[in-house]
Amino acid sequence: MPFGLGLPEILVIGVIALLIFGPKKLPEMGSALGKAIRGFKSGVSDEPAPQQSASKETAPNPPQSLPSGKDS
């Protein structure tokens, strides 16, 4: 289990949350939390693609020599 929490600890946390927020508010909060997590995951997965393309576009060009017209 994540963070070293077993089933008994998760059940105790669930019962405490149920007592604090009530049976009507708890499903609404769970739904909002799920939407927030989905939004965060989609934002994180979309983030690396623009950074990679931006780094390719901003790569420095090699210096070009200009014709001087003078013979040395």
Swiss-Prot record:
Top-rank taxon, per record: Bacteria
One GO cellular component term noted in the UniProt record for this chain: TAT protein transport complex
Organism: Gloeobacter violaceus (strain ATCC 29082 / PCC 7421)
Chief subcellular location: membrane
GO terms, biological process: protein transport by the Tat complex
GO molecular function, one term: protein transmembrane transporter activity
Location in the cell: Cell inner membrane
Record field: transmembrane: 1-21
Protein's UniProt name: Sec-independent protein translocase protein TatA
Pfam families: TatA_B_E (PF02416)
Assembly description: Forms a complex with TatC.
Family affiliation: Belongs to the TatA/E family.
Species lineage: Bacteria, Bacillati, Cyanobacteriota, Cyanophyceae, Gloeobacterales
Region of interest called Disordered, as start-end residue ranges on this chain: 41-72
Keyword line: Cell inner membrane, Cell membrane, Membrane, Protein transport, Translocation, Transmembrane, Transmembrane helix, Transport
HAMAP family: TatA_E
Function: Part of the twin-arginine translocation (Tat) system that transports large folded proteins containing a characteristic twin-arginine motif in their signal peptide across membranes. TatA could form the protein-conducting channel of the Tat system.
Record membrane topology: Single-pass membrane protein
Signal peptide span: none
